[in-house]
Amino acid sequence: TPRVLIDVMVRLMQPKYGEVIQDPAAGTAGFLISASHYMQEQKDVFELNELDYERFKNSTFYGMEHVQDTHRLGVMNMILHGLDGENDSAGLIYGDTLSPKGQTLPQSDLILTNPPFGSKKGGGLPTRDDFTYATSNKQLAFLQHIYRHLKPGGRAAVVLPDNVLFEGNIGRSIRQDLMHK
């Protein structure tokens, strides 16, 4: 995802200290790092009290990436930007968000993501049992993950191709379901 687009999306969403921020298709963790930078521009992390600093470092940023080499780059990127918390469930997890492992990501105040385009690798369906609609369309599957993992009042900024707006059948059902949330 182009850095300019990431930064614009983060600025529009205005992440705040104390929020849980997630990227279910994290790649090299660009959205998570940009959110951290934005938050630190608003208030220096070293001005936080000890409890808030620990929460920022260990319980704010969550992501998942299923391409192993990309995951390694993302973990290194987070470490280089000081987001190497001590909480094993936080940070960048290696796994497929569209599998049951994706259900382990926390309910979030803010989700920022650019899910991969196309059908799930091998044409298989996501193996999540919490999705209402079975689809091999990755964007529609990620959309279901996103609105299931937002806390009440949560916000999301997502890069999606325009076909998601016009997809018939399952796509229409997912959009209607989203509008009723």
List each language-model region with its residue ranges.
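Conserved S-adenosyl-L-methionine
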Residues: 2-110, 118-120, 129, 136, ...
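Rossmann-like S-adenosyl-L-methionine
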Residues: 125-126, 134, 138-141, 145-148
